[in-house]
Amino acid sequence: MSPPAPEQKPQLQQQQQQQGSSSGDSSSGSANDSKSVTPAPSATSNTSQSSTAPSTSSDDNLICRWNACNQKFPAPEALYEHICERHVGRKSTNNLNLTCQWNSCRTTTVKRDHITSHIRVHVPLKPHKCDFCGKSFKRPQDLKKHVKTHADDSVLVRPSQDPQGGLNYRPQPPKGMSHLDSSPRLYYDHTGQMRTNAAAFAHQAGHPSGGYYAPQPSTNYGLYFNQPPINNARTEHLGYSAAAGGYDRKRTYDMVDDFFGSAKRRQIDPSSYAQIGRSLMPLHGNLSVPNGPMTATEQYMPQPAPAPVHAGPTPSQNPLAQQYYLPMPSARTQKDLIHIDTILGQMQDTIYENANHATAGVHIHHAENGFNGYRNTPSPPTSHRSPTGMHVGADGYQPVSAASMASPLTAISSTGTPAVTPPSSSMSYTSGHSPSPSSSAMSPQSRHGSTASVMYPTLPTSLPAVSQGFGHSATTTLGPSFDGSERRRYSGGMLQRARAGPLPLPREDTSGASTPKASESALSVGSPSSESDVSDATREREEQYDRWLENMRVIETLREYVRGRLERKEFVEDNESPRSSHSDAMDVDPKSPQAPPRELGTPREGSSLYPILRMPGA
């Protein structure tokens, strides 16, 4: 019907122009009036045909097709009752027929209820109506399946039951669009959001309720989702992520409070790096929520008040529109904060002491916003190169100690070869002042390319005299610095020189005409298996270093938070209220060594016939 409509308008306009030129102004006016009232002949014929077609089809559906019955009935209910009583029969009357004989169906069942339910497929009887959308179904199981599609709509309020008209989830479409689509097509996308037909609401983009259905807070319940004020139609789904920022902050406060409670109850050993890492794992990346860092001043976060998205009465203010978050129960008093700060300090020291295990063999790259806040000494950071030539910037993590400085013995000597024997003073020592048994802590790469040997201050290496040259070792570095085991022989790079680079090619043939041999080109390319092994090991070390770094960041953030609250005195005073002068004589203050003052008129010892028992501490 819609395609021929544009073609009919030019034909009618041409006929009216011809009539107007022949008859005059009056006839043209009458022609225009007739145009607005009289429809096109083709349109009338099509509408008449469409109106008669459903009537004939409905009459055909009300004829009994059971074998050669061909009896006609006025309603589907009468046809259904006729088939059940006349053709199916009953067992009590000894005429039960369990085989469907509608046309050529021949469906056989085992019970009468089964075949009577099957007959609904042939009869246009739909007695089962959906309460949500009003759609009718033939069988109850079909309605049951259909109702499951409205599972997400079970909390919605029907428009007829909503007294305020503006608090339901599914507002009625505007009156101006009733001629396009009286029932807008609703569907759910893959995210579970309710959508509507875009074509039906295309011209209503300026209307607040034309492009989407937004959830509104109900004033009948205490818990609901708040929606921020929205003044324009949006194409993306809204969802329930309006208060995501506040939820993240509340979740962060809960996790920090749980961590403080576990630390106070000594459920976390401050000297165990493994337990500290497991307890800090939930806080990784959560102390910097999208709305800003965790600060001590924000003890409550008010939520925005609900705003109407579409036309209708403004909902009344719900008392739960603003939610106030109380301070942390585990860090309320000054004593709690001091205790937590002490435990955090012990945990921080433990993390520092385990830096050699977490950062072994990891190169600290230069970063623009590097992590330079955790240095042991106030001395300025240094800048040196790792054995691979990578520059270690001053913004990277560099706890400064004597071991992090490049030893003059590892510098290039006058002969152009690096010193072979590593000095004992530049090695990493544990708390027992013995050389670390791990080979990674003794390798030159770990000593200068990472922070494996920065735990304890070591004796600085004195520069040799100029006459000795830089190729000789200092007196303080002579002597064995290893244990007597055979591990020294197979340490793998401890006393071995690094492989020299490829020799320079001869310069007589620079034209490039000759092709290098395969063996020469293969020297510079490692095998894929070795590269994959190295990459996996490197990735594991980097992940371990990232976890260690994140633990240090979390501990520093928590300590800054606790110290900030102590400096601003943001804690609950635990001062006890003064005792009343007319308290009971049996009240005993266990904290005070002195008894409450005796009131005037009380009998002293000896003035009564019975002795007065002294209370403890009196």
Swiss-Prot record:
Residues 1-59, 144-180, 375-396, 413-540, 571-618 are annotated as: Disordered. A zinc finger (C2H2-type) spans 62-87, 98-122, 128-150. Keywords: Activator, Cytoplasm, DNA-binding, Metal-binding, Nucleus, Repeat, Repressor, Transcription, Transcription regulation, Zinc, Zinc-finger. SMART domains: ZnF_C2H2 (SM00355). GO terms for cellular component: cytoplasm; nucleus. Residues 13-58, 422-446 have a biased composition (Low complexity). Belongs to the pacC/RIM101 family. This is pH-response transcription factor pacC/RIM101. It comes from Fusarium fujikuroi (Bakanae and foot rot disease fungus). The gene is pacC.
